[in-house]
Regions:
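Short active-site oxyanion
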Residues: 38-42, 63-64, 151-154, 208-210, ...
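Asp-based, Mg2+/Mn2+-dependent phosphohydrolase catalytic module
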Residues: 225, 233-265
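Residue-level signal for inorganic ion chemistry
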Residues: 34, 154, 196, 223, ...
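Asp-based phosphoryl-transfer active-site loop
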Residues: 3-20
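Active-site phosphate-binding/coordination module
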Residues: 25-123
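Short, structured coil segments at secondary-structure junctions
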Residues: 59-62, 70, 169-172, 225-226, ...
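Conserved acidic, metal-coordinating active-site core of Asp-based
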Residues: 98, 102-213, 217, 221-222, ...
Length: 265
């Protein structure tokens, strides 16, 4: 087997448990062991950079880099930026009237923050899942800011069967769903896989020398792209179907078990 030199990890549902709202101790120890072995480890998340800082409170080491906002903003531990791409401003202008008319909740992601047009029961559900009951706050200026600010991603609180309605107004964008109640929206040519390409090009690592772990629909492109794509046991069926390997859940040492299976640790 090709020696693995870089591994990419989703956060929520992959290294962080939805049940305990934290990183299992064994998973943290395994991640640290990878670094000690000289393997580079990277976060690959739909979260914006400011929503990844909590990792510093949970771990006594740093990742080598971060693929954030589903690949739209990628940077190394030293702060060097490898990828920086915003959503089509034309798409955003086109879809805002649809959101208003249909009272659709949307969170607009910036690099250093986010703002929301309205809150509803689906938003409350996500706050509970993330263990952050006050994460989202309505901004009365949301629609004005959506036009004037650089928006990297939308979190649109619709069910899968409702996606087509708003995507009809966003021809340069695509949905990247990882849960039932909402979908991430990113550029059509974006995705965590583009972040992987930026990272390995920087370090001179071959694609076949990479692994990726994920559990959600927004991880599919990444898992298909990496040398070895591993779906967590708690992943959706659509994710498991495309994975090279299905491990146990995040709460049952899924990261560690898969790495042992492939003799990485």
């Amino acid at each position: 087997m090709t020696k693995i030199k870089a591994i990419f990890f989703d956060i929520d549902g992959t290294i962080r448990s939805f049940k305990t709202k934290t990183i299992p101790e064994n998973t943290a120890n395994t991640l640290k062991k990878l670094k000690e072995q000289g393997i580079k480890i990277f976060i690959a998340t739909g979260r914006a950079p400011f929503h990844t800082t909590f990792l510093n409170d949970l771990l006594d080491f740093k990742f080598d880099g971060y693929i954030t906002i589903n690949g739209q903003y990628c940077y190394l531990e030293n702060g060097e930026v490898l990828n920086d791409k915003i959503l089509s401003q034309e798409d955003i202008k086109n879809v805002l009237p649809y959101f208003k008319e249909n009272k659709i909740a949307c969170d607009f992601a910036l690099l250093d923050g986010a703002f929301m047009n309205l809150k509803n029961s689906r938003v409350k559900w996500l706050e509970d899942e993330l263990g952050d009951p006050e994460r989202f706050k309505e901004d009365p200026l949301a629609y004005d800011k959506a036009i004037s600010e650089k928006i990297y991603q939308l979190n649109v609180f619709v069910l899968e069967e409702e996606e087509a309605g708003f995507l009809a107004y966003m021809p340069n964008s695509k949905a990247a769903r990882w849960t039932t109640h909402f979908t991430d929206v990113i550029p059509k040519d974006g995705g965590k896989n583009t972040g992987i390409d930026a990272v390995i090009a920087h370090f001179g690592i071959k694609l076949e020398e990479t692994m990726a772990f994920g559990d959600g629909g927004n991880d599919i492109d990444m898992l298909k792209h990496a040398g070895i794509g591993v779906a967590m046991g708690n992943a959706g069926e659509n994710v498991k179907e495309i994975a090279d390997y299905i491990t146990t859940s995040v709460d049952d040492d899924g990261i560690t078990n898969a790495l042992k299976h492939f003799n990485v640790i």
